[in-house]
Amino acid sequence: MADKPHMNLAVIGHVDHGKSTFVGRLMFETGAVPAHLIEKYKAEAKEKGKESFAFAWVMDTLKEERERGVTIDISHKRFDTDKYYFTVVDCPGHRDFVKNMITGASQADAAVLVVAAPDGVMAQTKEHVFLSRTLGINQLIVAINKMDAAKYSEDRYNEVKKEVSQLLGMVGFKADDVPFIPTSAFEGDNITKSSANTPWYTGPALLECLNNLTVPSKPDTLPLRIPVQDAYTISGIGTVPVGRVETGIMKKGQKVTFMPSGATGEVKSIEMHHEEWDQAVPGDNIGWNVRGIGKNDVRRGDVCGPADKPPSVADEFTGQIVVLQHPSAITVGYTPVFHCHTAQTACTLMAINKKLDPKSGQVKEENPTYIKAGDAAIVTIKPTRPMCIEPVSEIPQLGRFAIRDMGMTIAAGMCMSVTQKK
């Protein structure tokens, strides 16, 4: 299984543009979902009058999602091509799920943007493309989907392609380097092989485009960083934090420190998939036990690193943000919640240093009095309690964040520099 390189693939795009069906079809065509299961889902979906959702039900396994026909939590599914094995992060499309999208996309190495041919670019198409870019996804494939509903029209395909290309250019993707494919996830067009329904399209099918992706280099040369997702107390063992290794390598016997608490100890054991390992590398989801660490020393949002190169704890930091939505204007003193790796911390906006043109990154205004939806800016931020964050130039995996308030994602951004807590 581990012989093929592994890639995390995000599937993004506006709600109801067919993302879940698309992923279901992909899983089915690569043999990851047995045909009899699809038949069973088809029968169930037909009973509920949602026949076209059969493939989507592979992904939407949560009952509530089935009833609403909406993908809520991020479902992880695996499929193989002859070159890679992929874990699909099916990113939810509805408005209130952007936070999931941010935590989902930040785990992705590449993304497929699904745009429905009849609708073209919609509000969330823009938002997702924008977020993916901010979150550091730089490999993209565009599937212009539901071609069956657009009667396989080449003209319509070209119109949407032009629209999407303009959007990609705005956020800094080179549209010429991005493959565009006309697909119908429901009918299976251009997923595994070229379709007779689109004789005017001579490019590769989706699977070939997936094989053409390049594996990002593993950040195992960077210092060890593991954001803690949870900490458990297990009788006979002690405190076991769990989390995903973002950078570096953890070895048994290593001295590690948890920040911001500062608790330090020696790694006694590392466990993954119920097996003991001598070391853990980036991408591994592990539980590990540290000698001398008690239940109260570690909590969600802490970051584990080497004792001699501990994670940075910010007194203040400078960030580049993009405001996605806000009912009015954002001014100095605003204190929303920042979601960074596994931490959720209220932070105060101390200064708006520069307003940028979101398309080009050029400075539009120095020290503006406010910023609003659609603006990009360089800002100074002060966490209300100690928080680990690293500059994206040093450890990108711990440098990206989302800003939430009033039940919505206000902005996304990245940390440019950190003033360390003394």
UniProtKB/Swiss-Prot annotation:
Keywords: Cytoplasm, Elongation factor, GTP-binding, Hydrolase, Magnesium, Metal-binding, Nucleotide-binding, Protein biosynthesis. It is an enzyme of class 3 (hydrolase). Residues 69-73 are annotated as: G2. The keyword Metal-binding applies. Its EC number is 3.6.5.3. Residues 184-186 are annotated as: G5. Residues 4-218 form the tr-type G domain. Residues 13-20 are annotated as: G1. GO terms for cellular component: cytoplasm. It catalyses: GTP + H2O = GDP + phosphate + H(+). The keyword Lipoprotein does not apply. It comes from the Archaea. It is found in: Cytoplasm. Residues 145-148 are annotated as: G4. One of its GO terms (molecular function) is GTPase activity. Its main location: cytoplasm. Mg(2+) binds at residue 20. SUPFAM superfamilies: EF-Tu/eEF-1alpha/eIF2-gamma C-terminal domain, P-loop containing nucleoside triphosphate hydrolases, Translation proteins. Residues 90-93 are annotated as: G3. Pfam families: GTP-eEF1A_C (PF22594), GTP_EFTU (PF00009), GTP_EFTU_D2 (PF03144). GTP binds at residues 13-20, 90-94, 145-148. GTP hydrolase that promotes the GTP-dependent binding of aminoacyl-tRNA to the A-site of ribosomes during protein biosynthesis. Belongs to the TRAFAC class translation factor GTPase superfamily. Classic translation factor GTPase family. EF-Tu/EF-1A subfamily. NCBIfam families: EF-1_alpha (TIGR00483), PRK12317.1 (NF008969), small_GTP (TIGR00231). This is Elongation factor 1-alpha. It comes from Methanococcoides burtonii (strain DSM 6242 / NBRC 107633 / OCM 468 / ACE-M). The lineage of its organism: Archaea, Methanobacteriati, Methanobacteriota, Stenosarchaea group, Methanomicrobia.
